[in-house]
């Protein structure tokens, strides 16, 4: 890992005895032991988990990536990691099952537990039904194949369109408009400038979430309608 002995000894010392408490309002529970996992909120925890989970990437690389070659210039995409969320990509049924087998073996060896209730498969396609061979399992349990999955707030559909994402963002943003209007009414401030500033601070971040990905998509009318609806309600 490139870390010297002093750093490793310091980390061992930090995790030799880990205790925690739970805060509920102004109250604290009694201390209890935490024999597994990383310290919550500790600055080193994200780095330590990244080093830990990187073992999975190495194993998939070793046994064959079976990923997706987006273009000749790009490297083969086979995994996305964000905190403890893992996304596996493959362009074949056998390739994905191989990745799942590696994940199962690596998780067992590292003492990780995979939540199968939150583990789904999306087959990206132009249409039609799934083939008989398009089935996958993890440690002997069948995995559910779904038409849509939300990853980091973005809805991924089988056709790789963002129409469902637009509707989801618009609905979430629309629910926030009454709160802004109520605040303006409470403080007795009906200036358009104040309304626009509140909209830009509270609603616009919701509407533009993930726009780095879908910003060039043509069908964004549902997003703009939230802005027009908010203006009409304000007036």
Residue ranges of predicted features:
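Non-catalytic, peripheral interaction segments enriched in hydrophobic/basic residues
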Residues: 83-84, 118-120, 124-126, 150-235
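Active-site palm subdomain of RNA-directed nucleic acid polymerases
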Residues: 51-83, 87, 96
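Short, conserved micro-motifs composed of acidic
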Residues: 11, 16, 26, 113-147
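Conserved, non-catalytic sequence blocks in retroelement Pol enzymes and Pol-derived host proteins
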Residues: 1-6, 37-47, 69-74, 90-96, ...
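Catalytic palm active-site di-aspartate
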Residues: 37-41, 45, 71-92, 103, ...
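Conserved pre-catalytic core of RNA-dependent polymerases
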Residues: 1-55
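Short, well-ordered alpha-helical packing segments
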Residues: 12, 57, 87, 97-108, ...
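Secondary-structure transition/capping motifs at alpha-helix termini
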Residues: 1-6, 62-63, 109-113
